[in-house]
Amino acid sequence: DMWNRCKSDLDYGLYFQEWWEKDVTAMVRKDYNHPSVVLYSVGNEIPEIGTDHGAKTCHDICEKIRSLDDTRFTLASINGVFAAGDKVDQIVADVSADLVEKGELDGNVNDFMTLMDDHMDEIVVHDAISERLEKACASVDIAGYNYMTARYEMDGEKYPNRVIVGSETYPPEIARNWELVKKLAHVIGDFTWTGWDYIGEAGVGVPAYQWGEGGFGAGFPCQLAYSGDIDITGFRRPASYFREVVFGLRKEPYITVQDPNHYGQNLIKTPWVISDSVSTWNWKGCEGKPVVVEIYAPGDEVELFVNGVSQGRKPSGVQAGYRTLFETVYEPGNVTAVAYESGQEMGRMELQSADADAELWAQTEDTKGKELVYIDIALKDKEGRVLTDSDVKLTAEVTGDASAAGFGSGNPKPVYNFNEGVTETFHGRALLILRKTKEGGHGTVTFRAEDGRSATVNY
């Protein structure tokens, strides 16, 4: 993630010259026989990659990799803004002036991060970035573009031999990106940031309604990035279904619901945030209040039903960016979305409100012969529906041949550490990970909620 220029105090940049050849050799040898390895990345968002010295370093790394394995391709994941970091002031001035002239900006924006939120396309096509990319892409087989979708078509025309992949892209832009992947032969795919959520870059994907609650400036207790298609406990988030629909892998629509507690409020979000929606029809205290239902759907039309009453049809699929919004009123019961293609039903999905008297449920995943044991916990009613709007504090009592390695939820703002043995459910779910103390170890785990509910499982 860095070469000679450090990104933070005491990072790998201090040791790069001494270690890069050894580390490249270890990387290639470790995975040489794995057929799933198709690319070797020589660096991600390297600040100096567009300089003469950086271009030489890139060349040296690529040649080292090829000497060890000439069957795979090399890739550099390039952030054009990072590569032209010393030109940021000029880029801001030029882009701002151009937008003011077009009447798209009032002329008061002088902060680069603010400009990036709304005008990344204009920034990444700046000549200063174009100049740096020529050096950055000179030695690699594939040019990885981080957040530079606006360059796909223009660079294909200017550099007909340049093969491009979206090496990091914003989750909300997958519909736009995928249309370009299908259209342009020189753009071979798309990697989102990110697949699985992680600890760090706290708040980058957290939707907020007050400054400091989300985004890069999120304060305590925010710990997770919250930008993953899959949350940190392994459950799919709405963005993963959005992507599945865009890829043409899902014919049924997918229903999510924006939080009605914030209806009409201004959502503060980074480019990694789609919305604050959750796939649930449980919103305690919001009965009779307006709500936005967000549907990801293929086909050309999608229809929404609330408790059996049609809310009308709206365009869906590629013409709507695969994302359709309906305004309605929340009432417990059920919502159903039906996708159509040329008037014929393609698929449907229903969300039902879970009963408030849900029980604590726990299930051990099959991990025989493995050191780690994963136990899913949820608040479920008798029909197996997860109660998402009444989260509870949980404790875990472990007996037998294991100890708790981590106990938590997908909440980006957990109030307990993962090793405390205490957590709160998030949207009705949590996860406990055990580490066995001996091979073939077994025992029991009892989960207790602060309201008296409990569940016991064997491992």
Q: Model-predicted segments: where are they?
A:
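Short, exposed coil/turn segments at beta-strand boundaries within extracellular/luminal domains
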Residues: 342-347, 449-456
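Short, hydrophobic beta-strand segments
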Residues: 324-330, 419-438
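Extended low-complexity, serine/threonine- and proline-enriched intrinsically disordered segments
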Residues: 300-309, 391-406
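Conserved structural position at the C-terminal beta-strand
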Residues: 339, 379, 447-449
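Substrate-binding cleft of carbohydrate-active enzyme catalytic domains
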Residues: 1-69, 75-78
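Short, solvent-exposed loop/turn segments enriched in Ser/Thr/Gly
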Residues: 369-375, 441
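Short aromatic-acidic-glycine turn motif
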Residues: 314-316, 357-361, 397-413
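Substrate-binding clefts and catalytic carboxylate motifs of secreted carbohydrate-active enzymes
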Residues: 36-40, 62-67, 74-370, 382-386
